[in-house]
């Protein structure tokens, strides 16, 4: 995202993206669009509607913004899936627009799958990491990789290069295939991740997350549901052993905590907007009330 200030009640965005603007299962507004929020002086966030045109150059026009000077700053979220070739932010003549530097604070680092990447929210501000960042007023680094969030040692090494205040490891949605990932392999990867992160960042909390769709009652495809439930059970068993061994500063977000139901996903796996809100709320509750991290 990009933070900026302006005294204009009209804001123009122009951008071009590198890939297809939409997917069969995800609208152009989520795949290739942007999203504008404004942060108030007391920490509250307001969303801003836009007039949108998806052509070769994508345009957004935000207008009639009530007294922009009242807001601490604006936050423009970038596309959830597409790479941006170029982007312009504009305001009418005689108004100002000032880009703000990156937040100078330790981030929350989240490593995971396409779900973390934002699939399948309808617009960028509704990806769960973006919702959580607003709720916690915290800098977030999203390391979501479609089909490739698998807790590989090489990826943990890269995650470990970032000095974070919290690490979220949400990879079970890419580890459910037992023909590729045995229970023993999942345990090996979870233990390696904990050991390596705490070796370099002692005392920093780590969250291990179950498969968000790993509970009964989400969809009628019970064959797939049982695979998701099974990998959640493996994750829970490993976490329980680690806690019993006295490993500290590790936490678990369960599928029950996330609490998906029949309205939460687009395809039985990836959350829709409802599921994204449930996901973010579950993380927020764990981080604020159990870990005690406020900002």
Task: Give a label for each model feature.
Residues 1, 127, 152, 272:
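Residue-level signal for threonine
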Residues 13, 141-143, 208:
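A structural signal for short, well-ordered beta-strand segments and their strand-loop junctions
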Residues 1-107, 284, 288-295:
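N-terminal secretory targeting modules
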Residues 153-295:
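Alpha-helical cap/lid subdomain in secreted, periplasmic
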Residues 22-24, 117-120, 176-180, 218:
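A generic structural signal for short coil/turn motifs at secondary-structure boundaries
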Residues 19, 114, 146, 173, ...:
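Residue-level signal for short, function-critical loop segments
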Residues 67-68, 74-146, 153-163:
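Serine-esterase "nucleophile elbow" of acetyl-processing enzymes
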């Amino acid at each position: 995202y990009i933070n900026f200030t302006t005294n204009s009640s009209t804001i123009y965005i122009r951008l071009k993206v590198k890939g297809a603007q939409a997917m069969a299962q995800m609208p152009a507004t989520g795949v290739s669009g942007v999203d504008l929020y404004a942060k108030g002086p007391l920490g509250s966030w307001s969303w801003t509607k836009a007039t949108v045109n998806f052509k070769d150059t994508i345009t957004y026009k935000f207008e009639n913004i009530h007294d922009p000077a009242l807001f601490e700053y604006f936050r423009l979220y970038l596309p959830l899936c597409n790479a941006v070739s170029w982007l312009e932010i504009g305001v009418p003549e005689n108004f100002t627009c000032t880009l703000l530097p990156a937040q100078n604070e330790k981030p929350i680092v989240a490593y995971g799958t396409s779900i973390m990447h934002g699939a399948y929210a309808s617009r960028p501000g509704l990806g769960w990491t973006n919702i959580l960042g607003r709720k916690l007023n915290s800098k977030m680094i999203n390391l979501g990789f479609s089909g490739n969030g698998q807790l590989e040692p090489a990826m943990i090494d890269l995650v470990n290069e970032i000095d974070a205040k919290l690490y979220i490891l949400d990879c079970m949605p890419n580890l459910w295939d037992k023909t590729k990932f045995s229970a023993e392999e999942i345990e090996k990867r979870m233990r390696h991740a904990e050991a390596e992160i705490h070796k370099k960042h002692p005392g920093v909390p780590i969250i291990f997350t179950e498969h968000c769709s790993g509970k009964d009652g989400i969809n009628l495809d019970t064959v797939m549901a049982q695979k998701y439930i099974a990998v959640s059970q493996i994750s829970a068993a490993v976490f329980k052993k680690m806690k019993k061994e006295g490993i500290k500063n590790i936490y678990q977000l369960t599928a029950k905590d996330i609490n998906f139901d029949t309205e939460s996903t687009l395809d039985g796996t990836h959350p829709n907007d409802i599921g994204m809100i449930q996901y973010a709320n579950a993380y927020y509750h764990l981080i604020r009330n159990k870990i005690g991290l406020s900002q």
